[in-house]
Amino acid sequence: MKATGIVVEYNPFHNGHKLHLNKARELTQADVVIAVMSGSFVQRGEPAILPKWERTRMALAAGVDMVVELPVSFATQHATIFAEEAVRILDAIHVDTLFFGSEHGVAEDFTLAAKKVVENEARFDEAIQLALVDKKTSYARAYTEAFKKLFGQNLLDITKPNNILGFHYALAAQKQNPSISLHSIPREHAGYHDEEANHDQIASATAIRKLILAGKLEEASHYLPASSIAILRNYEGPFLSWTDYWSFLQYRLIQAGSEELEGIRGVSEGIQNRMQQAATKAQNFSDFIELTKTKRYSNARLQRTALQILLNARSQTSSPYIRILGMNKTGQQYLSLHKKNISLPIITTVSKAPAGLLEEELRATNIYTLAKGLENYQAGDFHIPPILTL
């Protein structure tokens, strides 16, 4: 069976995702499409708008054959680690092709850029450090400056959000298994972070979440496939944002000592002190980010750091594993064929997982389900089995 892998958040699953999924199957001639999906919290350092099990249902209803969870310790980090670990899981599960959307849309250019970085790794790292010192800027900007300086302006624009992820997928594949074929299509219509829904049927997940959180589900439904609309209408829990967790974060920052926070993943350069001061002044999470912001810290980095503090995520990361959130018959058949040749632990029953392997994931789910209205999902990692569909 020919397998194509995709890396997703489905926050929530919308028409753009449906187009991407259909193209992935069509253009790669895949027998099975496997999605590695973020769980309770997503890469920009935010809670997912609804629980991972509901988003898994959306994925399966739309035609994904298998949904595998990207562990929270990787799903909530910067693009390099996010991509590295997603590709590691897809490689372990033996996908032939990695398919992704990007602003650029030409997979060969991503591969070429990745090869150049691998071949010039020492020079590239040195250029990044020089940019950090000379310009006193964020790591992301220093990375982009170093890339342009060494490889020119025209190779690939890694300032665009999906190009950044695509480049890091290509880099991870180049380092881990260059035989994985890359395939990319250009994103259509909505930009990744567009906050307004301006097109007939395609809008960004950001714009769709904005509508849903404002209670405008009917308006948001114009940009969602029928299967997602049905799941959203049947969902009895709340739609979530940082608003639901702000008081927990505020308490954590006020209660903890500065030295205690130094050991949290992503905390550096004394940023915890700014955060602790802001926590006593901010009225809400948006205020908090504005009060904490500096030239060296992007909003996304601040959100990720705040999330790691909320989750009490220590600097060490967990080991990778394959945690099945859901599958259809095709996915079950594929897993049965390859199970013996998969090098990472496969988890379908959490209670049978190796001791300690899921510790961070379980804590993240428990914190996520503290939000009012999620009582039915508390301890869900234990009592909600993988979702199986015909």
Swiss-Prot record:
Residues holding ATP: 7-20, 101, 162, 187
Subcellular compartments: Cytoplasm
GO cellular component, one term: cytoplasm
MF terms (GO), sorted A to Z: ATP binding; ligase activity, forming carbon-nitrogen bonds; tRNA binding
EC number assigned by the record: 6.3.4.-
UniProt record, GO biological process: tRNA modification
Record keyword Signal present: no
Described purpose of this protein according to its UniProt entry: Catalyzes the formation of N(4)-acetylcytidine (ac(4)C) at the wobble position of elongator tRNA(Met), using acetate and ATP as substrates. First activates an acetate ion to form acetyladenylate (Ac-AMP) and then transfers the acetyl group to tRNA to form ac(4)C34.
Family recorded in the similarity comment: Belongs to the TmcAL family.
Official protein name in the record: tRNA(Met) cytidine acetate ligase
Organism: Listeria monocytogenes serotype 4b (strain CLIP80459)
Gene from which the chain derives: tmcAL
